[in-house]
Swiss-Prot record:
UniProt-listed NCBIfam families: HMG_CoA_R_NADP
Pfam families xref list: HMG-CoA_red
Keyword Ribonucleoprotein in record: no
Annotated source species: Cannabis sativa
Taxonomic lineage from the root: Eukaryota, Viridiplantae, Streptophyta, Embryophyta, Tracheophyta
Family: Belongs to the HMG-CoA reductase family.
Protein name in the entry: 3-hydroxy-3-methylglutaryl coenzyme A reductase
Amino acid sequence: MDVRSRRSTKSGPAEPIKALKKAHHNEESPKASDALPLPLYVTNVVFFTLFFSVVYFLLTRWREKIRTSTPLHVLTFSEISAVFALIASFIYLLGFFGIDFVQSLILRPTTDVWAADDEEEEQESILIKDDTRKVPCGAALECPLPQIAPPVVVSSKSALPKVIDTVPATTEEDEEIIKSVLDGKTPSYSLETKLGDCHRAASIRREALQRLTGKSLSGLPLNGFDYDSILGQCCEMPVGYVQIPVGIAGPLLLDGREYCVPMATTEGCLVASTNRGCKAIHLSGGSFSVLLKDGITRAPVVRFNTARRAADLKFFLEEPNNFETLTMVFNRSSRFARLQTIKCTIAGKNLYMRFCCTTGDAMGMNMISKGVQNVLDFLQNDFPDMDVIGISGNFCSDKKPAAVNWIEGRGKSVVCEATIKGEVVRKVLKTNVEALVELNMLKNLTGSAMAGALGGFNAHASNIVSAVFIATGQDPAQNVESSHCITMMEPVNDGKDLHVSVTMPSIEVGTVGGGTQLASQSACLNLLGVKGANREVAGSNARMLATIVAGAVLAGELSLMSALAAGQLVNSHMKYNRSNKNLTTPTP
């Protein structure tokens, strides 16, 4: 059998044996100081003291001779004695410390010792084998070592055992912490604070989880990730990270510039289809976008004793003179937050106030929440009977399909359009203008209306939005309202060419904060040229990212609709989006 083994960097079972044998060999080798009659420390102290004392005496005498112009070769009896004492002490010290060094060069270990070491290393390499037991790592430590079977010759490489990377064995200190977590003495969420090492905390938490559940996490990577970067910002109590492949669609020609669009997805055909749409747009002269609106929203809900008092606050907020004062209060929360509007609606004695503001290059939910809190504190001076029920009353509306977002917009409202040449429709998209226009009307418009869709008048906008969001560090949950889209297709130029557009009223994106600061997501933003905050024009990077999302959606809509019109959808998905793996193997 083809045995593949890795040298362990940890102390294995064979290392103590080797250490004992080497120690035994060293004990048999005679030392130069073994036969000294006096204790070593006594003789060493005497000769060290003699050596430095004589050196000091001679230097002092020679300095006096130089001052008095006495020849140096004229020596007194005391100086002659000092020279002999210096030579004697130097010979002793050289002999004592030099013989051990010479012995280490001359008296090498015998070949028998090295042969024994090689034999131990060979046994150690056999013991280091892949741990394929279906038990947690901690339980595996308590299990006896398996019997080593004799090697078996196999004729096929497919019969070789699969090599699985194992997690390094925990130290005694880590073992105590793991047991403390399992016993409930140490909260799992406090490991980062107590240890001061985020990677070590994740490793200990992971091992404790495996022992607690009895399930292996061998397929979930642990190493290769900066856990310090997510502390207190992106994720709590991490035990690893999930790998999602990132593909590139493009170049997307948008507003005269080319963009390579990163898409993180596990759906086959998605990147390829979007890439085909980008090609069709590029060959037709590119696409063009318009930013219609920019403003994130937050809508707190407050309650009064009567509906009349709720209406009084509504009228107060809608008064232009009062709005200027509220704007000053709101804008104090951040140098980027700028209040735009406050729209109110009443439900009985409850009032919902929908604040809308710009937030620079950040998506802005935290920023607007601070500004809203400032305004609520200010309003309670004039309306002390106002009871703040919640800073979010779902009139925002965040991460939920809502008509208010579809009509009023939330985040960035963008429309993107392109005119596709008839020749490109036929040669690249493999269909014709008439078929696309008819399919779009019956599917995206009539079909969605029959389904009672809210913002879903499109083929698959959420596919592209989700893929770009994950790749660039956006909030994937905000794909709900960010994917609101209506796709329009009309014949132009006497029916020869196709005008296609997507209108997306609530794209919620940012280029700073949240997941955008992670290394992988930051690299994807850098690829698009929108990494971080724009120092020249605040918010321009986030607005550009929103237009890129809309442009990618336009390409994806164009390609999928063409595949449907040409009857290619099933064939392409069977070719690129079908798994051939055996899914019947049980998971431990």
